[in-house]
Design a protein with these regions (language model features):
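S-adenosylmethionine
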Residues: 1-180, 185, 191-192, 196-205, ...
Length: 472
């Protein structure tokens, strides 16, 4: 019996995620699966992300009907069970027999045929039983931590947000964008989107040094509508849009980097970097923040560092700007003796603010990882502080919700380096508001003391933290 392409692909991706440190978002967009039809790609994404988001509920259902502990299953068998159980518990449109039979076939094709009968029996019991989706599907230690740090109500909001597929945010590239009107049926041929895009289109921005800007290719929201893509205004930023429907990666605007996929909180962190002449981006891949810095500072020089050469190559491909130099280097051991006006440390972190997009993280992460990461973050931050010019600024950010990776890092860094002071992010957000970059009215909702903080479920974004340090 053949297995449908999306189920076979989902099985392969889930196996790789379980066996390695691979990320679902990267595997789903790999060339290996690029030839799937649009419908099959949609089902593939649903199967992979759903099975990861709801693994807690799925594993409870499997354990309820199995005499064998889950830890005793072969990886291939447990993956097939999880894939089948997700369809039975959450996808009403999938016939139960298809979910069961193809999961059994996956086990056979993985040369685990001796377990086929058991897989069949467990999934049929799940299919006949009640659908209990009440579990929050997060590790207890993580929920307990959020409850302690944010309270039970916000902890629940975080979990609920993480268990829902988030809408994709995109940013209008001010380097290349010259946008026409929206299509009928997709909001804003006239209105916020049209005004917002036209204001950011290169020909409509002020001339540089009295010289008109060069013409760039025009793209229209009509073009996106023709591809089945509908955009609505973002939630925080003038330059951000939200994908209401369709696949933006299939559009010419995306392929030509006129629209960049980037969460709004990530965009906001890059805007906090501000203006300058010489920039250092210490942990720059995948490059979204670097690109914003380059767009905001076209006459500056920017050095973008990335530890891993293959990620540095991807960074260079995304940024594609003459004023950006990409180097593969360890941010803890900066290879040049140079000072910068602005330094961005978007530190490697636990990623607990991005679990809606990266649900595999919550099943990999261990409590002890957070303190281990803190040590790494402190090393990077200490090295970066040595390269800030007098009067210059360092912006430290993570996509973590954990205080140990955020406030505690800043406190420890300032305790051993009296040359720096903490700058209140409130002032920077007000300036962004005055420049009509920031569209939200309640700036205070984005703050935790002097720091920027967004929380999934409280804000319609990933969870981010940022602090601004200024050298005296």
């Amino acid at each position: 019996m053949p297995v449908s392409p999306p189920r076979a692909a989902a099985f392969e991706i889930l196996l790789r995620i379980d066996a390695t440190d691979a990320y679902a978002s990267e595997l789903l967009h790999s060339l290996r699966f690029s030839k799937l039809s649009s419908a099959d790609r949609g089902l593939l994404t649903e199967l992979v992300m759903g099975a990861l988001r709801w693994r807690g509920v799925i594993d409870q259902a499997i354990a309820k009907h199995s005499a064998q502990p889950l830890g005793k299953f072969d990886r291939e068998v447990l993956t097939a069970l999880r894939l089948g159980a997700y369809q039975l518990l959450f996808l009403d449109r999938i016939p139960a027999h298809a979910a069961v039979n193809e999961s059994v076939e996956l086990v056979k094709q993985a040369r685990k045929g001796s377990a086929a009968g058991m897989v069949n029996a467990i999934l049929r019991k799940i299919a006949k039983g009640p659908r209990d989706r009440s579990d929050i599907s997060h590790p207890d230690w993580l929920v307990d931590r959020w409850t302690q740090n944010y309270g039970s109500e916000i902890a629940r909001k975080i979990c609920d947000y993480n268990n829902t597929a988030p809408r994709q945010a995109v940013r209008i590239s001010t380097i290349q964008s010259n946008v026409g009107t929206a299509a009928p049926g997709c909001p804003r041929a006239e209105g916020p989107i049209g005004k917002r895009i036209e204001a950011n289109s290169e020909p409509n921005r002020a001339a540089v040094d009295g010289q008109p800007r060069a013409a760039v290719p025009t793209w229209s929201l009509d073009d996106l509508r023709a591809d089945g893509i509908c955009l609505v205004p973002g939630n925080l930023l003038r330059n951000a849009l939200t994908v209401k429907s369709g696949d933006i990666t299939h559009s010419e605007a995306f392929r030509e980097r006129r629209l960049i996929i980037q969460d709004e909180a990530s965009q906001l962190v890059a805007l906090l970097v501000g203006k300058g002449k010489a920039f250092l981006d210490c942990c720059a891949a995948p490059g979204g923040k670097t690109r914003i810095i380059a767009e905001q500072n076209p006459d500056s020089t920017i050095m973008a560092m990335e530890l891993h050469p293959h990620r540095a190559a991807l960074l260079k491909k995304l940024v594609m700007s003459d004023n950006v130099r990409v180097i593969a280097a360890d941010a803890r051991q900066f290879p040049l003796d140079k000072k910068f006006d602005r330094v961005l440390v978007d530190a490697p972190c636990s990623g607990t603010g991005t679990l809606a997009r990266n649900p595999e993280i919550k099943w990999r992460l261990k409590a002890e990882d957070i303190l281990r990461l803190q040590g790494y973050q402190l090393e990077i931050l200490a090295a970066a502080m040595n390269h800030v010019a007098p009067g210059g600024r360092l912006i430290y950010s993570t996509c973590s919700l954990e205080p140990e990776e955020n406030e505690r890092v800043i406190e420890k860094a300032l305790a051993v380096n009296a040359e720096f002071r903490l700058v209140d992010c409130r002032d920077e957000l007000r300036m962004l508001k005055e420049r009509h970059e920031l569209m939200i009215d309640n700036i205070e909702s984005l703050l935790s003391g002097a720091h920027l903080r967004t929380i999934p479920g409280v804000h319609p974004t990933d969870g981010f933290f940022a602090a601004i340090l200024e050298k005296k």
